Amino acid sequence: MTGISDEEIRILADTGTHVLSGPMTNAYIKNRCPVVELLESGVNVAFCTDASAPNRTYDLLEKLRIGLWLHRSHFKDANVLTAGKALEMITIDAAKALGLDDELGSLEEGKKADLVLFDTQKPHLYPLWQEPLRLVYQASGHDVDAVIISGRLLMENRTVSTVDEQSILTAAQREAEKMLDRTGFRESAGMPKRFWKSTRY
């Protein structure tokens, strides 16, 4: 959500509307969602990944960092949007946006046991202190070692136990190839002619 006026922010706050911000998408269109202004007006905001094409990923921690950089750059203030608030925006605030904050988003008695476990035994995550800050500023989806949903272990040692990953990847590639042939966009899937030794496409 971009291009929101002060009046529209007030309406969003008054109506209890939740807002999702896709920081990479906002940067790609040379704009920003006024996350700080929304938060300070009482609007619940969560960071999201939006999509993976054409140059994005589904790495939520990467998007979180881009969101921090965008807003700190905009306000020219490194203290804008704390790391802790950003982490809340992909956990409890995201659950709130889905209307599931009584079930998900935080580790509390009575809530579902949905956990993401990170492998911290990696050089970029050392030294091991201020772990939440390490998570926000240095970790990525590649550091996720295990995932537990409703108490059920679905991924361990970076291996998903409930699906055959290779067959899914093979099927996805096959469908993508069909889509290129069907739409006539196969040439667009190649490397840009000006990829190397050029500052502009």
Spans of features found by a protein language model:
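His/Asp/Glu-enriched, well-ordered alpha-helical/loop segment
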Residues: 36-125, 136-140
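Conserved strand-to-helix beginnings and helix N-cap segments that scaffold or border functional pockets
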Residues: 9, 31-32, 57-60, 129, ...
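Short, conserved sequence motifs enriched in acidic/basic residues, glycine, and aromatics
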Residues: 2-3, 80, 162
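Conserved beta-strand positions in the central sheet of alpha/beta enzyme cores
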Residues: 20-21, 117
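Active-site microenvironment of metallo-dependent hydrolases
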Residues: 91-201
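Short, acidic/turn-prone active-site loops that include or flank metal/cofactor-
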Residues: 23-27, 50-53
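Histidine/acidic residue-rich metal-binding segments in metalloenzymes
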Residues: 1-18, 29-45, 102
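Flexible loop residues that form catalytic
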Residues: 1-2, 72, 121, 152
